[in-house]
Amino acid sequence: LVLMEGHAAEKRNLKPIARLVAYGHAGVDPKFMGIGPVPAVQNALRRANLKIADLDIIESNEAFAVQAFAVAKELHFDPEKTNPNGGAVALGHPIGATGSILTIKAIYELHRKSGRYALVTMCIGGGQGIAAIFERL
């Protein structure tokens, strides 16, 4: 996974496969650990001027099953678009690599399905959440 400004890619004759459209982060009361992605996703969608229905792929980290279910239910994720090739409960999520793994999965799935937008989101310890929206190029 390589991130860089568009002009830096052009200068090196690299062809980007996606662009970061927007991101969001948020925190909730730590008693509700795992639900932080909800306001983070809402922030990212607002910044991108998009709705959940505009997303073609959703890669939502599964810290554990009930946490993933709560986020998906609260945000009304389409199960057909969410973790289409399996999530962390099935595949694992090495600490420190989760964001990169989810981003790569989302971008490659966008290309495979010729979709436009992908959402990547995960909870972070202490009630925090983070989300990013990518567009296929």
Regions found by a protein language model. Give the residues of each.
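Channel- or pocket-lining gating/hinge segments that regulate access to a cavity or pore
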Residues: 1-17
